């Protein structure tokens, strides 16, 4: 998919690879990449890591810099739901998955085991995507009964999240659309369908689309702010890629001390939420090293 295809897509004019970004493909509003798609190059497999290491900056005067929003969707969910437990955890820079595990399994934070944290992480993300007890049991390799108990405990401890989910579905039923943080709408005509499968799909979108869509809004605002700043300051550093919650730059070596903190500042302040944004920044000789 990549090893054979990517070398053939190198431009004969500047000897670089150029992708196309489209705004109107993904229903959530996230940018999609094609020709070639640079947003789905794996990083967890050894081959994927080798492929990422093949991406290098434009010349020896540059490094790669990766700036990645940390847990942006969970932060947006906590902000939308006004869940005090989650908000407090994010404000105090606590491990959100360990915090969730402590609440769900009713143990002290320091007593949370790696297995508890793993299950809590799956619940944190799964709930936002409408995960059921069956889905959770499959993903975690546990019984459906145990999965149902975990979800019930989660909703008891994080009642504001449950309220947000119910309110989102009710809003969508009335309006037949949901909105992102900046007011961009996703229409859900099937939310009142008599077909339970069709309706269920729309209900899951009613919960998740405002969150995913708001994440898309926020990173686009950040991209505009960063681009304008780079142009205004006449810097040599260039923004080269957007991979969902990550921005990748050709960072000029002489500009590291200026660009790194400013990019973090602009990304964190793109849209102000109830919880602070966190941005993880890495620098390296190639994309793998920078991530």
Each language-model region and where it sits:
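Conserved catalytic core of nucleotide polymerization and phosphodiester-bond processing enzymes
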Residues: 1-291
